[in-house]
Amino acid sequence: MEYDLEFLKNFDGNILPSLINISDLVNVTEKHVSQFRYFYSSDKSEFPEIIIEFKNLHIPHLLGLSKDHHLNLSTYQAREIINNLKRDWNLEYLKSSDEQWFAENKDKLVGVLLLYQLLHVQNCRVLTPLYIINSNFGRRFKRDNVYFIILRSTNNKEYTIELAPMKNHDNVFIPKSLKINDTHVHKCSEISLTFLRSERIKYDKKRGKGRK
């Protein structure tokens, strides 16, 4: 199966996680989803314009490849993880080095393949927990500083990407987490979010100089 732009646009979530080629997953995500800023208009006066900034370095966290979720990686540096996934860290390696990781995070592999649709608000609902008052659900979102949630229902599952504000930016948000069948979202309020455009994040040559 070839993972390309048409695949991302039309993917319905119907795939066995064990059959996903993780190198191809990372490559197609880098090419068509990450390293972009996504621009939206909303019906909320507090946030008339919303920007989501999604970088390559967010990918490992969304896959559950962190110290908290996978116990036996040789590195937890996001850039190194991405490079290893494109080379020799195939799915069998990740499973054999921590069997519990796959059991707990396999649906996130599917969720990452749905990120194109989530970020383009394609057949999605957009929610906010900002108006939840005095509830356990509200406290969880407040703790994680989640402002917005984009939800895609498909193949009898709900995939949600949670968005938190970028430091020192009022209307720019970054992916906080990717969740599946999170019941907390049903306490959230639905809002209208319209995708306007996306722009490739240009590589900063000055900051990147000297990096290997």
Question: Could you describe each region identified by the protein language model?
Answer:
Residues M1-F148, K212:
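An acidic, glycine-rich, mixed-charge low-complexity segment common to nucleic-acid enzymes
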Residues N105-K206:
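Conserved binding-pocket/active-site segment within a compact domain
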Residues K206-K212:
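Non-transmembrane domains of secretory- and envelope-associated proteins
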